[in-house]
Amino acid sequence: MAALQLSWKARSDLVSVGEYTRRNWGEAQAIRYLDKIQDCMDRLAENPMLGRACDEILPGRRRMEEGRHVIFYRIEKRRIMISRILHQSMLPQGRVQ
């Protein structure tokens, strides 16, 4: 299993997702949704190739959808680097590093 590392932008994205969900659908739903995103990232750590390649956005990047969000990541030697967690309506160009 590869180690997971989140960029500071990905951490900020998670906080924003949690705050938005909490504000609009309540605490319990925010916890459930953030747990689903964490489960998805854990699956990526187990099998990094689950996500699709998205070289058109940035070479070497992959993406995995969870709910209405997309997790962008790259596979490194011993870790999975999560670069962003964006809502599906957000264009990733210029946001994913």
Give, region by region, the residue ranges found by the protein language model.
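Short, well-structured N-terminal submotif of metal-dependent ribonuclease cores
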Residues: 1-6, 90-92
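Short acidic-hydrophobic surface loop/beta-edge motif
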Residues: 62-66
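Basic, Lys/Arg-enriched alpha-helical interface segments
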Residues: 3-61
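A generic local structural motif
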Residues: 58, 68-69
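Non-catalytic interaction surface on structured domains
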Residues: 1-4, 24, 72-74, 79
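Enriched for short, Lys/Arg-rich terminal
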Residues: 69-70, 74-97
